[in-house]
Regions:
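Acidic Gly/Asp/Thr-rich repetitive segments characteristic of extracellular carbohydrate-active
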Residues: 1-35
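Alpha-solenoid helical-repeat scaffolds
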Residues: 190-284, 292-296, 303, 309, ...
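Small/polar beta-strand repeat architecture
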Residues: 182-234, 369-372, 378-422, 429-430
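Ser/Thr/Gly-rich low-complexity blocks that favor extended beta-strand/coil architectures
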Residues: 91, 115-117, 126, 142-204, ...
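Solenoid scaffold repeats with emphasis on beta-solenoid/beta-helix
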Residues: 34, 72-75, 80, 87, ...
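Short glycine/acidic-rich loop motifs that flank beta-strands on beta-rich extracellular proteins
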Residues: 31, 91-97, 117-121, 235-238, ...
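Extracellular beta-strand-rich solenoid/capping regions of secreted or surface-exposed proteins
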Residues: 19-28, 42-81, 90-109, 117-135, ...
Length: 583
């Protein structure tokens, strides 16, 4: 990389050199290894590769954000290794760190990446007190969060572009969203932001310390907490894998993911191994992602996520799903008009000729009779331009549309684009949301992981045709040999969105929870709706409280509209409520 002018000293912008090196590698049309020297490389967005792209779970069809800047772009290539050589890549502004587009056998390895000015401000409450009858807080701000005090407000300036002289992003006071981190307790949760209520004065004390005086009299009780504040637009993915096959991320430090996480979209075989998704301890920050860490949407083959750390996201660490498109028209006997229904997802193709689909009734979330067909033609968005409508598509099948299909009452899932999944030997901590979300009909194994202090369900299984439209059912899910410490209940939550619940027609099937350790407070361990075949065996459940505390009241098991439930050979501490509630 240095031969093309990249600067490992970190004094100059290496973007043009990185772009030139990757373009040359592409021109070679053979297996290639692109290598950095050990050092620090600055990467600015102004001269980065730019592509019009539409990405799942981000900004949908919003034309303000259609052009994405990409620091490291592997495009229309095969057999490529990006070897960081232990380098630190520092990204500036709003850009995707790296992407694989229409490529095969791609490995990103052996580097750390960071953003100079994250879109999240981690404001630590250094101290609190009362002076002359009025409360105050003193905030400590990390170095990567420039600011200016304007009267009784704080303007967050988000780093100045050397090209325009303007900040890459900006906001005021609490921005648009807040979550709270307790570094001592090692917990993070979503909540209200009291920092900017009842303000009397704001003073810049220098050295990145700000004093806020209030009109109120009570001393704030949040000294030591960190208010993680951000905007809400997911303008680009942190990293992007699209229409690619056999892509690996290995031995990396992902210190921060700007605007969103790693998105795998309509690709095949994605592996994430030994990736440390966590902030640099020296940075003073506690946030490592603007939203999710890993989002897999419409991926097929195998998704493998192993030996990694997930610490400090602003949404779910791992979410693996497809997309339900709603039937909104029937232009012909063998064709349907389908629509994206959630505003964050649009603009890219969901189907290709040869893909198999399943027709699902929204109210029951179960397949229609004669529910499968094969796609023969698609007229819809390309994912890389806006020449056609971005929220609808017309899909033609190899057979007449089933009689039970209803406009606005049926959704369609691409069941070819569903992966088998292995999530093994990972650590999840400081998570404000769920730990793992997974909805795929292929085999799923979640094993050897440690979930500590999740603020919502540690493992969540949905199938949603009413809000997020994230598909589909699970048919073979094994949760084995994990530890769940200090969880929020329910620890394992199965919640499809079916409005009609019939135990004879469950949405999900064959879920096994075995040989796990649960160290719990007074919470429900399993809350499962519409499951046919649920086994909870050979698990150990221990109370966090000592024996002299009162017994817990929450039932360990709650089932709704489920059948073939087996709970056996588990070990329970005294004082747990081993009731099974079923309706």
């Amino acid at each position: 990389m240095d031969a093309y002018g990249a600067d490992p000293t970190g004094r100059t912008d290496s973007t043009p050199a990185v772009k030139a090196a990757l373009r040359h590698a592409k021109s070679m049309h053979r297996p290639v290894r692109v290598v950095f020297s050990k050092g620090t490389y600055q990467l600015y967005p102004e001269r980065a590769e730019t592509r019009e792209l539409y990405v799942s779970n981000t900004v949908g069809a919003d034309q303000r954000y259609r052009d994405k800047r990409i620091g490291l772009l592997v495009e229309d290539m095969h057999d490529v290794t990006i070897d960081g050589g232990g380098a630190e890549l520092v990204y500036h502004g709003l850009q995707t760190a790296f992407a694989s587009i229409r490529s095969a056998n791609v490995t990103f390895t052996n580097f750390s990446f960071e953003y100079a000015a994250p879109e999240v401000v981690d404001a630590s409450v250094a101290s609190t007190g009362v002076t002359d009858g009025h409360a105050y807080r003193i905030l400590s701000i990390p170095a990567g969060s420039p600011y200016r005090v304007d009267g009784t407000h704080i303007a967050w300036l988000g780093e100045t572009s050397p090209a325009t002289g303007q900040p890459y992003w900006s906001g005021v006071d609490g921005l648009q969203y807040t979550q709270i981190h307790d570094p001592k307790a090692q917990r993070t949760w979503r909540g209200d932001n009291p920092l900017f209520n009842d303000i009397a004065a704001v003073t810049d004390l220098g050295h990145r310390r700000i004093r806020i005086d209030y009109t109120t009299t009570a001393r704030p009780e949040d000294a030591g907490l960190v208010y993680q504040m951000r905007l809400i637009e997911r303008t680009e993915p942190g990293a992007f894998i699209w229409q690619s096959k056999n892509v690996t991320m290995r031995s990396m430090n992902a210190r921060y993911l700007q605007s969103f996480g790693v998105v795998g979209q309509f690709s095949e075989n994605i592996s994430i191994d030994r990736v440390n998704f966590a902030p640099d301890p020296a940075s003073g920050r506690s946030t490592a992602s603007f939203a999710d860490f890993v989002q897999m949407s419409g991926v097929k083959g195998k998704v493998s996520i192993t030996r990694s750390v997930f610490d400090g996201p602003h949404d779910d660490p791992i979410n693996i799903h497809g997309t339900y498109l709603e039937v909104v028209g029937r232009p012909g006997p063998s064709s349907l008009t389908l629509a994206y229904e959630h505003p964050q997802t649009a603009g890219f193709p969901q189907f290709a000729p040869g893909d198999e689909v399943e027709f699902t009734a929204k109210r029951t979330m179960t397949p229609l009779a004669d529910a499968h067909a094969v796609v023969t033609a698609v007229d819809g968005p390309s994912g890389q331009d806006h020449n056609k409508p971005l929220t609808t598509m017309t899909v033609t099948f190899d057979r007449p549309v089933p009689a039970g299909v209803e406009i606005n009452g049926t959704v369609v899932e691409n069941i070819t684009a569903t992966p088998s999944v292995v999530i093994a030997d990972n650590v999840f901590r400081n998570v404000p949301t769920r730990g793992v979300l997974v909805t795929t009909r292929k085999p799923v194994l979640i094993t050897g992981n440690r979930f500590d202090g999740m603020s919502m369900a540690s493992i969540y299984v949905s199938a949603d045709a009413y809000q997020w439209y994230e598909s589909g059912p699970v048919a073979d899910l094994t949760i084995r040999g994990n530890s769940f410490t200090r969880p929020t209940g329910p620890v394992i939550f199965v919640e499809p969105t079916n409005q009609v619940v019939d135990p004879a027609k469950p949405v999900h099937h064959n879920i096994k929870v075995e040989h796990n350790f649960f160290d719990i407070g007074d919470v429900t361990v399993v809350d499962a709706k519409s499951v046919g075949g649920f086994a909870f065996t050979a698990n150990t459940l221990r109370r966090l409280d000592t024996a002299d505390h009162p017994p817990y009241s929450s039932p360990l098991f709650v089932f709704h509209g489920s059948s073939d439930i087996r709970i056996a050979h588990n070990h329970y501490d005294k004082g747990l409520n081993t009731s099974v509630v079923s309706d």
